[in-house]
Amino acid sequence: AAVPSGASTGIYEALELRAVEHINKTIAPALVSKLAMQEFMILPVGASSFRIGAEVYHNLKDATNVGDEGGFAPNILENKEALELLKAGYTDQVVIGMDVAASEFYRFTASAGIQVVGDDLTVTNPKRAASEKSCNCLLLKVNQIGSVTESLQACKLAQSNGWGVMVSHRSGETEDTFIADLVVGLCTGQIKTGAPCRSERYNQILRIEEELGSKSFRNPLAK
């Protein structure tokens, strides 16, 4: 029930909402959006360069807010609306990645042709994740695992189970470019390092590509 917080019962009196029902039906809907996804990411799987990802990113220029990792944080309420924003005219070359933070998504690994990337699960207990087939790709965060040696071991464990490996930064970390060298050295073919405006790692990958020349990795799905 709505109970006046003081002696006055006037229309401007602040109300103290004591019942849990008010929290569930009044407060929560006003504060929490309907998005079930933490992040929507662009994966230019058919690209031969960074251009496609950058163009999709710039297609979102009307969004006003920018998140911690350089991604746009527009005021949207539904998942479908977020997916519509990511359209930029490419077909069969760009796919959408979603950070859903859902413990139930492991069921998809056996029934659907999608990549399910394990985050905290693979850091805390990678052997259990592999044995239970909870996911099919490792999100490799060096500063979360603890050391480069342990990161290499985790990568080998994942690959020995037929998993993919995605090298990743962590929110709030420095501009150090080491993970760009790591993703090339491990030949994982996947990196998660924020939006193009956070360009340090992308520039390092471009420098590596320039140095390697014809020996550099080429996306087999590029058109």
UniProtKB/Swiss-Prot annotation:
Substrate binds at residues 39, 119, 168-171, 192. Mg(2+) 2 binds at residues 99, 119. ISGylated. Lysine 2-hydroxyisobutyrylation (Khib) by p300/EP300 activates the phosphopyruvate hydratase activity. The modification N6-malonyllysine is found at residues 87, 215. The modification Phosphotyrosine is found at residue 12. SUPFAM superfamilies: Enolase C-terminal domain-like (SSF51604), Enolase N-terminal domain-like (SSF54826). The modification N6-acetyllysine is found at residues 25, 61, 87, 133, 141, 215. It is an enzyme of class 4 (lyase). The modification N6-succinyllysine is found at residues 87, 215. Pathway: Carbohydrate degradation; glycolysis; pyruvate from D-glyceraldehyde 3-phosphate: step 4/5. Keywords: Acetylation, Cell membrane, Cytoplasm, Glycolysis, Lyase, Magnesium, Membrane, Metal-binding, Phosphoprotein, Plasminogen activation, Repressor, Transcription, Transcription regulation, Ubl conjugation. GO terms for molecular function: magnesium ion binding; phosphopyruvate hydratase activity. The keyword Protein transport does not apply. Glycolytic enzyme the catalyzes the conversion of 2-phosphoglycerate to phosphoenolpyruvate. In addition to glycolysis, involved in various processes such as growth control, hypoxia tolerance and allergic responses. May also function in the intravascular and pericellular fibrinolytic system due to its ability to serve as a receptor and activator of plasminogen on the cell surface of several cell-types such as leukocytes and neurons. Stimulates immunoglobulin production. This is Alpha-enolase. It comes from Mesocricetus auratus (Golden hamster). The gene is ENO1.
